Regions:
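Positively charged N-terminal leader segments that act as targeting/secretion signals
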Residues: 323, 327-342
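Cysteine-centered motifs
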Residues: 325-326, 337, 367-370, 382, ...
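Short, intrinsically disordered C-terminal tails of secreted or membrane-associated proteins
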Residues: 392-393, 397-403
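Hydrophobic alpha-helical transmembrane segments
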Residues: 1-175, 179, 187-326
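N-terminal, intrinsically disordered charge-dense segments
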Residues: 338, 349-351, 355, 377
Length: 404
């Protein structure tokens, strides 16, 4: 229940505030950790393809463990102080994991630069949110790049984090952000990241497999609420969702292309190398600047639907768990009250301590480590310096021997 409340609060803060410039961000710390470990492992591991792949696996495991364990430890410590402190801290963590308003703001900077006719400024603005080379892009290519990155990051930056936060709270959310950040920094097929980025890239494909497909379906639902062409969106999704090197990237891009009636993807330059890509969608019309705010609204509606879905799925389980805890507390309280009343009505009869049983004296006399002077305790006759378990074993074995 507390994690679900933190998710809702963090989502609302993200919609209102976004990521203020200059405010410390955990993802920046994760990125610095990745860079430091990458440099260190490149110096330590062999300069061979297998050595670099091993370095990538070590880096992935170390970053994931640290990124998950540190938030979990902080939440546990804050919970010891107060549950309200834990709620506040986890709400801030959820806010920093989500990226709805920041993605919308950065893409709208591209829109504003395009509307003002400043191609250089629009290239610079779009370079902040895409990984491709932007110095060769024209007006339409800049617009297409902005629409593509918003469509793709609807899954990576909005839907998938919401799902992981709903399942496991802030620690699992930071686990996802670590996996996604490593893929963004290292998951390239060109040197020097070809080998060291293999494990981070494949891990990101596995982690995003289900969220990417859920994102596509939720985006279709959002398009229906916005009055877009959902029939074309479903048709392009079924046809073009595999037209990408990544098994996940084209899921939401194909839906977006069909809903907007434009053509996305195509050839792109990365680190000076031209990558041939298939087009996604049909060119029912030319892409325009207005498609950028349109896809931003589509992303926001998709995010709200994801939050509602997450709350609707998790809330019954949270209430059931709370109900079980309440029932358990009531049962324990009833048992305690019953025992107290029965003790008051039927007080126990005081008994006098009897002398040690004959079998104990006989057994202790034959044991050199025992004393002949037993001590009465609540559990029976036991020597103080002797472990209780050993004395019980001797007593039980001796009693059995006597009975037989």
């Amino acid at each position: 229940m507390w994690s679900l409340a933190a998710l809702v609060i963090g989502f609302c803060i993200d919609l209102l505030v976004g990521d203020p410039h200059g405010f410390p961000h955990p993802v920046v710390l994760i990125g610095k950790c990745i860079s430091v470990l990458e440099r260190g492992l490149r110096c330590i591991c062999p300069k061979t393809p297998s050595g670099e792949r091993a370095a990538g696996a070590i880096l992935w495991g170390a970053v994931v463990i640290v990124s998950t364990a540190v938030p979990a430890l902080l939440l546990w410590l804050s919970g010891l102080v107060s549950p309200w402190l834990r709620l506040a801290l986890e709400s801030v963590m959820c806010w920093q994991i989500l990226a709805v308003k920041s993605l919308r703001d950065e893409s709208m900077k591209v829109y504003d630069a395009l509307e003002s006719g400043d191609l250089a400024a629009s290239r610079y603005a779009v370079s902040m949110i895409v990984g491709r080379d932007t110095d060769r892009l024209d007006d339409a290519a800049v617009t297409r790049a902005a629409v593509e990155t918003v469509a793709e990051n609807t899954s990576d930056g909005v839907v998938a984090p919401l799902l992981f936060l709903a399942i496991g709270g802030a620690p699992l959310g930071f686990f996802y952000k670590a996996v996604n950040t490593m893929d963004s920094m290292l998951g390239y097929v060109e040197p020097p990241y070809k080998n060291i980025g293999l494990v981070p890239a494949k891990a990101d494909d596995v982690v995003n497999y289900i969220p990417a497909r859920l994102s596509a379906l939720l985006m279709l639902a959002a398009g229906g609420l916005m009055g877009l062409d959902t029939a074309a969106g479903w048709r392009i999704f079924r046809r073009d969702r595999r037209k990408h090197a990544s098994p996940n990237s084209a899921q939401t891009e194909s839906v977006c292309a069909g809903l907007l009636g434009v053509r996305l993807a195509g050839d792109a330059w990365y680190h000076g190398v031209l990558h041939k890509k298939e087009y996604i969608g049909d060119a029912a019309r030319e892409i325009t600047h207005e498609d950028i705010p349109r896809v931003c609204r589509l992303m926001t509606v998709t995010a709200i639907l994801t939050l509602l879905l997450s709350c609707g799925v998790k809330l019954p389980f949270a209430l059931e768990r709370r109900h079980r805890c309440c029932i358990k507390r009531k049962i324990n309280m009833a048992a305690t009250c019953t025992a107290a009343v029965s003790h008051w009505i039927f007080p126990p009869t005081p008994t006098r301590l009897a002398r040690p049983p004959a079998f104990w004296r006989r057994y202790a006399a034959g044991c050199p480590s025992c004393t002949a002077t037993p001590t009465p305790t609540a559990a029976g006759w036991c020597r103080p310096s002797q472990p209780m378990s050993r004395c019980r074993r001797r007593m039980s074995s001796a009693g059995t021997a006597r009975r037989t």
